[in-house]
Amino acid sequence: MSTLTPILSSPGWELLESLQARLESQPMPLRELGAALRASGVEAELAAAVVTQLALRQAARKKFGPVATHMVFTRDGLEQATRLVVAARHAQRFRASGATRVADLGCGIGGDALAIAGLGLDVLAVDIDPDAAGAVAANLRDFEGAQVRLGDVMDVDVEELAGEGVDAIFADPARRTGASRGSARITNPEQWSPPLSTVLGWARTIERVGVKVAPGIAYDFIPADWHAQWVSVGGDLVEASLWSPALAPEGRGRSCLLLALSLLHICPFL
């Protein structure tokens, strides 16, 4: 059973939220908290699930700040998640382009979907991992215009998406081996899931397409009329992404986005 299952419904959810509030005012080691829960009669499985989630929320503060205390995570999902400050920049692109309903394909725990929904856009979040789908559903629980779908992005029919009112896509292809995006990185974009060429081809049907790629992507894989942007947060290179012309007001080419606590700087590549 997934460690998420016990906390995604009553009484697990209420227990998680009450303990989160208590820890904010009365911090204590999570190991001690787990022992106290079991001693009070809480089932071991539920106690473990709650403590695991509280630990993930603590770790997630580096990427999501205080918002993390209201979110649900998986270990793999947190590792792969877009930092909230970067996801906010993605969401701003979609809103500025006039998009109204964005499909977040390969959404993971929903960092980008959350930022998109937070700007008032409808979002369809799709992931093949049941744990990730459960997490993103919890994370989007306050947004009426958000929908979560469990499914393989490789099976997506973009014409059907367009028929559902989707007018923009953000994709995060799986770039690691293993069922849970395990250990080994896949460097060839045509071996990603879905392949980069497939994602780029979606723009023939839905013109607004953004895709998260490996920062070390070879320039040969970047379409001449798309915009590639590398993002640094606090001096660390954290991601690269490609944007179709409809999502790139800066035009084709390459740039880097430098984000810090009080500084935003964009430098174009010649």
Task: Give the residues covered by each predicted segment.
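Conserved small/polar residues in nucleotide/adenosyl-binding loops
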Residues: H265-F269
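S-adenosylmethionine
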Residues: G165-A240
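Conserved SAM-binding loop of SAM-dependent methyltransferases across substrates and taxa
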Residues: I109-L121
